[in-house]
């Protein structure tokens, strides 16, 4: 392969890297295959492989059924202030009406510069509120249960204080008592659920967690960047974490194995329900309108009455908080199919940036310091690369002579150029290695910006959110200029057409791609380019100049036409 073709190969590799970055994004990522479709017949849930055996929870004595609540009973709302969040409970279904996250970081622009706390509860007309309960004989009926009027039936508020609220009512033929309580843990709400009267007819109770992605929050095209909000039903069943595409072909699917936790993945946030121990089964279903869906957990009845103690996590996907829960909860952070091989590097970059952020208290500066650290670690390879580029620059006069000698005969020109490199022991690809080593870091940093709530809505200079594109396109344009300067300072290929492609097309194409990439990644690449330019100039000045006649006096290689091999 000739040296010019090697340059084309490098350009192809970089293009593939850029295309891969495109595929990593939500607007370029292929949808995940849906979990196994649900069967109509009820199937017993498989026990969790790692769950320790435990004795069944003693069933409470069945209490007399409370008087039915009128269907037109007015809605009662109770607010509980927890650690990092505020929940509003409704008597309609005894469920979550609103979940607001506290802190300036967790605010959403509602238009006109107005910010309001993020609300994790998003349901559409016809959906029950999260944590509604329905008695059902099988999990296959979860889709029907989501539209069952019993899921929205009024319940009676029987007790409440600043730390808890208790609701009683009926769900179909079952008597239900719910006690919501603050646990003191960040973003956690406890739920004590008592159900009686459902065993004979249904032998099970379903807890619903529906959600809705408003169409207005979807991506509006390439230059708008990836969607800020999205919603996917999610379940950790057994040792597998499964997600359901609400816009896919399947109407319903179920998880296999005892439920560790289940709920809704909401990008940088998650709402998840934890049974006290892995049990039951989960299912996913599409909602009544496009963009809506629900996760359902079916808990078995053991006798005529049963009591369940559950925990509900309602907050950001902070890696430390998720790991504290165990049960594979950190698998809720999904780097996507393309970036999954770089998950280790993504978490490593996050740890390094967190350490820098604690020192400088700004994530943009932390990214700059990360760039400097990577340049220092790659310095030995960069120095060797610069030396190789310097040697190639010395050979430019000889390459020009070869071009004049062989004219348009590319085969002879490439062969003569390669012989010239071999004669002077120059590796034409030596200058490419540091850039190739940067590609995994780009992928990992992109995945980190798309999944790590630590960087969500973190500002830097004029940029309000490093996880979103630069709204003024200053960084992408600056990055394009720096890429052009780097190419201009690098030795050019012998082929003028290839030289023009490397000098003009690649920086322009790269700039176009980076217009909608998270600003944090663009900042990293721009700073890396600037450091590379400075490093190149400093090292070139320190390198000894070419000895007089060292390359110019050397006779250019004589190339004779070789007969083609048969």
Predicted regions and their residues:
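Generic low-polarity alpha-helical segments
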Residues: 68-73, 80, 187, 534, ...
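Mixed-charge, polar/low-complexity N-terminal
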Residues: 1, 60-62, 66-69, 244, ...
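Intrinsically disordered, low-complexity sequence elements enriched in Ser/Thr/Gly/Pro
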Residues: 4-5, 44, 84, 150, ...
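Helix-loop-helix
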Residues: 1-39, 89, 191-194, 215-227, ...
């Amino acid at each position: 392969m000739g040296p010019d073709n090697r340059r084309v190969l490098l350009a192809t590799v970089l293009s593939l890297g850029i295309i891969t970055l495109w595929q990593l994004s939500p607007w370029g990522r292929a949808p995940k295959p849906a979990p196994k479709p649900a069967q109509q017949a009820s199937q017993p849930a498989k026990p969790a492989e790692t769950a320790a055996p435990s004795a069944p929870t003693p069933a409470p004595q069945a209490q007399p059924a409370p008087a039915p609540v009128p269907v037109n009973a007015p809605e009662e709302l109770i607010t509980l202030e927890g650690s990092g969040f505020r929940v509003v409970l409704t008597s309609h279904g005894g469920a979550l009406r609103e979940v607001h996250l506290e802190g300036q970081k967790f605010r959403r622009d509602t238009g006109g510069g107005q910010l309001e706390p993020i609300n994790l509860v998003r349901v559409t007309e016809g959906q029950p509120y999260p944590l509604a309960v329905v008695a059902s004989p099988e999990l296959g009926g979860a889709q029907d249960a989501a539209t069952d009027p019993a899921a929205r039936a009024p319940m009676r508020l029987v007790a409440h204080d600043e730390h808890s609220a208790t609701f009683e009512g009926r769900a179909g033929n079952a008597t239900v008592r719910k006690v919501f309580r603050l646990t003191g843990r960040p973003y956690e709400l406890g739920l004590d659920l008592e159900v009686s009267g459902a065993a004979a007819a249904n032998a099970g109770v379903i807890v619903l967690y529906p959600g809705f992605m408003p169409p207005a929050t979807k991506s509006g095209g390439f230059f708008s960047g990836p969607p800020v909000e999205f919603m996917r039903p999610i379940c950790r069943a057994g040792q597998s974490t499964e997600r359901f595409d609400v816009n896919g072909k399947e109407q319903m699917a179920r998880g296999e194995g005892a439920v560790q936790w289940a709920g809704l993945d909401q990008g940088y946030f998650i709402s998840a329900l934890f049974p006290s121990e892995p049990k039951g089964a989960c299912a996913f279903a599409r909602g009544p309108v496009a963009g809506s869906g629900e996760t359902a957990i079916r808990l078995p009845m053991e006798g005529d009455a049963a009591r369940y103690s559950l925990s509900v996590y309602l907050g950001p996907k902070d890696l430390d908080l998720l790991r504290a829960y165990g049960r594979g909860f950190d698998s809720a952070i999904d780097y996507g199919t393309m970036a999954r091989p770089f998950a280790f590097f993504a978490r490593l970059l996050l740890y390094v940036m967190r350490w820098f952020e604690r020192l400088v208290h700004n994530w943009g500066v932390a990214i700059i310091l990360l760039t400097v650290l990577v340049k220092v670690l790659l310095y030995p390879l960069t120095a060797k690369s610069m030396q190789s580029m310097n040697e190639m620059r010395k050979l430019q006069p000889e390459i020009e002579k070869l071009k004049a000698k062989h004219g348009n005969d590319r085969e002879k020109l490439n062969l003569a150029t390669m012989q010239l490199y071999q004669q002077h022991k120059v590796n034409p690809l030596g200058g490419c290695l540091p850039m190739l080593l940067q590609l995994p870091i780009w992928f990992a940093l992109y995945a980190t910006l798309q999944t790590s709530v630590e960087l969500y809505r973190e500002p830097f200079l004029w940029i309000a959110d490093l996880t979103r594109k630069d709204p003024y396109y200053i960084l992408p344009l600056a990055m394009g200029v720096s890429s052009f300067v780097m190419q201009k300072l690098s030795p050019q290929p012998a082929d003028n057409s290839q030289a023009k492609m490397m000098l003009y097309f690649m920086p322009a194409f790269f700039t176009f791609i980076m217009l909608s990439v998270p600003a944090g990644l663009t900042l990293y690449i721009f700073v890396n380019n600037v450091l590379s330019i400075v490093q190149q100039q400093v090292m070139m000045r320190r390198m000894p100049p070419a000895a007089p006649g060292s390359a110019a006096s050397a006779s250019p290689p004589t190339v004779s036409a070789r007969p083609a091999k048969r």
